């Protein structure tokens, strides 16, 4: 837990398609009614995939996106520290079709609450130290796979074959090597995915308590 009281940082980790984005958006939408639209923000770890614009498309698709080395956690840590110090940051935008950052960024101003969501957040001790609370979405892998196939085919322009190949070669092995072991660092473990109403209410109450402390 961070000792900095200027903003509350909540990290939500777990397997790909485990419900991280859903629970993050639900908490965001429900909390902003209480703390104000401009006092809560969401940062997606995917935005901090390393810039690969110097690589060919053939090289980019070979990147293991489920390994910590694929992410620029240095920049993410720097941005969180800037936000905690009261400074705005420029969050990178990432293209899933081009497999690299775009030339665009999104300005994020300091908030009372920052919700982080991403598969590998809890693997980095620097990020864990900045969090006031951490969550792990403990969704069964077979459910995650079904969701991932649907999402990647419908939203990210992938084919069924490429999604399954990536799952077998990198997604599942990296989950077992990095993501599953990081569960031990979570303050709260959420079963049954992002529609777990009890878990959402507990998280909202915990964040509200942190805001008052």
Curated annotation (Swiss-Prot):
SUPFAM superfamilies: P-loop containing nucleoside triphosphate hydrolases. Keywords: ATP-binding, Cytoplasm, Kinase, Nucleotide-binding, Transferase. One of its GO terms (biological process) is CTP salvage. InterPro entries: P-loop_NTPase, PRK/URK, Uridine_kinase, Uridine_kinase-like. It catalyses: uridine + ATP = UMP + ADP + H(+); cytidine + ATP = CMP + ADP + H(+). Pfam families: PRK. The keyword ATP-binding applies. Its EC number is 2.7.1.48. One of its GO terms (cellular component) is cytoplasm. Pathway: Pyrimidine metabolism; CTP biosynthesis via salvage pathway; CTP from cytidine: step 1/3; Pyrimidine metabolism; UMP biosynthesis via salvage pathway; UMP from uridine: step 1/1. ATP binds at residues 14-21. One of its GO terms (molecular function) is uridine kinase activity. It is found in: Cytoplasm. Its main location: cytoplasm. HAMAP family: Uridine_kinase. Belongs to the uridine kinase family. This is Uridine kinase.
């Amino acid at each position: 837990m961070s000792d900095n009281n200027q903003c509350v940082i909540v990290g939500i980790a777990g397997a790909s398609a485990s419900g991280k984005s859903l629970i993050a958006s639900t908490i965001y939408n429900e909390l902003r009614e209480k703390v104000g639209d401009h006092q809560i923000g969401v940062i997606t770890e995917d935005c901090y995939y390393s810039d690969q614009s110097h690589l060919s498309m053939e090289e980019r698709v070979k990147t293991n996106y489920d390994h910590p080395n694929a992410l620029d956690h240095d920049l993410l840590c720097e941005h969180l520290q800037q936000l905690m110090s009261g400074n705005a940051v420029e969050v990178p935008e990432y293209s899933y079709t081009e497999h690299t950052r775009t030339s665009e960024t999104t300005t994020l101003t300091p908030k009372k609450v920052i919700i982080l969501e991403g598969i590998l957040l809890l693997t980095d001790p620097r990020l864990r130290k900045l969090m006031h609370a951490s969550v792990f979405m403990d969704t069964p892998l077979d459910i995650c796979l079904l969701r991932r196939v649907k999402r990647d085919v419908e939203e990210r322009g992938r084919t069924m074959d490429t999604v399954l190949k990536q799952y077998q070669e990198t997604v599942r092995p990296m989950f077992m090597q990095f993501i599953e072991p990081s569960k031990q660092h979570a303050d709260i473990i959420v079963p049954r995915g992002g529609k777990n109403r009890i878990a959402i209410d507990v998280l909202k109450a915990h964040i509200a308590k942190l805001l008052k402390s």
